[in-house]
């Protein structure tokens, strides 16, 4: 048997990797001056936001009016909208805001024309807007008894701002008389992203044509917030609750359209922020549409996708009567879970099936707990260590299987030579050898299969976890995005126009791992030249595809592979003894072995195939 010893080159490689990591950590620590500069920058940004809010309030107090001297323009306007010309065409906006969200509602159309998230900025330090500069439109289309087809965007609403306890209430009325009107009523609670939105009317029975449906029309272009528009676009899509609490979504990569029934809510998700419309009674039907606006990576493109929803509504006794809610806020499970009765947390892309379950009930709460008292990057490292410790029994089983196969290698090679011209006989004798030795060639695959759900769950967790958004670690300024350390003057297909460091470290670690698990056996077993190709291909694929992925995921795989390597080294050098394994296998060969059902079935199938082969030759 070969003498067990540590490869000095492998040890040197590990030491160098840790040395680089420690140096990068020390090198990238912000200085006290940099921390002070960041604090000053944030204070300037908050002051600018406050100044803008105050200026907006002053604007509301003194609304700008249409030039009423132009009698022809006024007459034309009143002629077009008929009875709703009672309300004076007064331009202006009203502000609703609390500590988390800022809204501006326009007199024209009565709709929200600006929605800003307080406390959040984009990758280039601009406040996060979900609605701005006409990117969104909400309107009701209806017919009147005098055969006009009106759109609420063409109507002027009269604003009245009041208080209901601690809540702010904005009543927007498009009047046909002093006591007859269409009303949009917004109600904002302190420190909440959910806005109550009621549409009702009074005295419009006979003015609105009740024989024709009301059409709700909601459109939005999703504003870009991240440094990679392609990456953000991958997680920007329409999600909706329908048909008995089923959660569905439109395609994220191409134009898509669906008509659904019993729709409870519609979410326009912009990666880490969402605009959601809920309806208390459920929409009977809703036609949903999504158009992809991103064809390639761009640093100047403003919008990622264009969304649209068309919903028919019925009048209630000849009047408007609909209870909605607007949600403008982060796609954060901690926030959305506050509205359990609406089920808005289901709009978060946890993943499907068991992968979503693992993300939602294991990784999300564990990471939330760890990051509550640890730096965000360190929390990932600790979570990785916990996962690897939990999976260490599977790692042990995998390495034990490899050790047994290594001990049997000379006998397998002998069988390959003896039956090189008879593949079926070679397979039968190999299976017989495994059975006698008490070795299962599939035992090494089972641990890998057990880890697959974790792999795919993490693939969704890191790029969509709001807790990681704009959280720095070492050289990475955002663990939910890529960690570019160099910008290229050109774009490499599939790779990008930048170089990310964590994917490089993860690729190096997985290369060493594959060297340990496949490198020693790749030249002597049949088919192993292909394994050498895979050993080089896997790290290369990680390097290429993870270059534009969440740096938190690359950090996880870097640390995970390092831990796995050290666990396997410990198992190899301090736990498993190949001499004992060899002796155990030889002892197993002496014992009578009874075929299990699977082995018996496999043997019978191979014998039948052999018989058919012989018959074919005759």
Q: Locations of the language-model features?
A:
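Helix-loop-helix
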Residues: 1-59, 105, 199-202, 217-232, ...
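Short linear motifs in intrinsically disordered/low-complexity regions
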Residues: 8-10, 68-71, 154-155, 597
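Short, Gly/Pro- and small/polar-rich lid/capping loops
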Residues: 54-91
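Generic low-polarity alpha-helical segments
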Residues: 84-87, 96, 508, 529
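Soluble non-transmembrane domains of integral membrane proteins
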Residues: 88, 93-345
């Amino acid at each position: 048997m070969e003498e067990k010893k540590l490869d000095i080159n492998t040890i040197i490689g590990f030491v160098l990797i840790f040395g680089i990591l420690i140096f990068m950590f020390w090198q990238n620590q912000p200085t006290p001056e940099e921390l002070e500069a960041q604090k000053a920058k944030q204070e300037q940004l908050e002051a600018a936001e406050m100044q803008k809010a105050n200026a907006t309030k002053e604007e509301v107090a003194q609304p700008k009016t249409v030039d009423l001297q132009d009698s022809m323009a006024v007459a034309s306007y009143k002629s077009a909208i008929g009875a709703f010309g009672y309300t004076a065409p007064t331009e202006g906006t009203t502000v609703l805001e609390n500590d988390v969200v800022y809204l501006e509602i326009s007199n024209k159309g009565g709709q929200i024309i600006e929605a800003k998230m307080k406390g959040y900025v984009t990758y280039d330090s601009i406040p996060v807007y979900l609605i701005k500069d006409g990117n969104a439109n909400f309107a009701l289309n209806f017919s009147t008894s005098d055969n006009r087809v009106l759109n609420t965007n063409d109507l002027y609403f009269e604003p009245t701002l009041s208080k209901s306890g601690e809540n702010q209430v904005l009543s927007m009325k498009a009047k046909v008389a002093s006591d007859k009107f269409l009303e949009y009523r917004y109600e904002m609670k302190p420190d909440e992203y959910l806005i109550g939105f009621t549409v009702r009317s009074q005295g419009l029975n006979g003015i609105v044509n009740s024989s024709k449906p009301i059409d709700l029309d909601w459109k939005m272009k999703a504003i870009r917030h991240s440094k990679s528009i392609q990456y953000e676009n991958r997680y920007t899509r329409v999600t909706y609750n329908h048909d008995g609490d089923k959660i569905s979504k439109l395609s994220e990569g191409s134009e898509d359209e669906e008509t659904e029934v019993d729709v409870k809510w519609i979410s326009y998700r912009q990666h880490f922020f969402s605009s959601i419309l809920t309806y208390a009674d459920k929409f009977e039907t809703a036609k949903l549409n999504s158009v992809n606006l991103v064809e390639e990576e761009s640093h100047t493109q403003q919008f990622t996708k264009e969304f649209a929803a068309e919903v028919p509504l019925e009048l209630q006794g000849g009047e408007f009567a609909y209870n909605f809610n607007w949600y403008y806020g982060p796609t954060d499970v901690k926030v959305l879970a506050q509205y359990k009765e609406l089920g808005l947390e289901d709009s978060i892309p946890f993943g499907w099936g068991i992968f979503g379950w693992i993300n939602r009930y294991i990784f999300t709460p564990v990471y939330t707990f760890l990051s509550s008292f640890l730096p965000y990057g360190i929390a990932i490292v600790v979570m990785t260590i916990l996962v690897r410790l939990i999976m260490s029994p599977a790692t042990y089983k995998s390495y034990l299987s490899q050790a047994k196969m290594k001990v049997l290698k000379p006998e397998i090679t002998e069988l390959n030579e003896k039956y090189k011209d008879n593949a079926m006989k070679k397979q039968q004798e190999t299976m017989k050898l495994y059975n006698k030795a008490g070795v299962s060639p599939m035992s090494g695959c089972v641990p890998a299969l057990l880890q697959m759900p974790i792999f795919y769950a993490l693939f969704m967790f890191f790029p969509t976890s709001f807790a990681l958004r704009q959280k720095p670690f070492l050289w990475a300024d955002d663990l939910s995005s890529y960690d570019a350390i160099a910008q290229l003057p050109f774009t490499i297909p599939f790779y990008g126009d930048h170089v990310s460091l964590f994917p490089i470290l993860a690729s190096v670690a997985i290369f060493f791992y594959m060297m340990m698990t496949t490198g020693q056996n790749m030249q002597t077993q049949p088919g192993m030249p292909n394994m050498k190709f895979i050993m080089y291909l896997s790290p290369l694929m990680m390097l290429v595809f993870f270059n534009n992925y969440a740096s938190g995921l690359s950090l996880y795989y870097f640390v995970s592979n390092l831990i796995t390597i050290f666990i396997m080294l410990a198992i190899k050098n301090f736990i498993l003894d190949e001499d004992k394994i060899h002796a155990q296998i030889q002892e197993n060969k002496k014992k009578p072995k009874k075929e299990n059902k699977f082995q018996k079935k496999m043997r019978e199938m191979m014998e039948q195939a052999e018989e058919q082969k012989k018959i074919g030759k005759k």
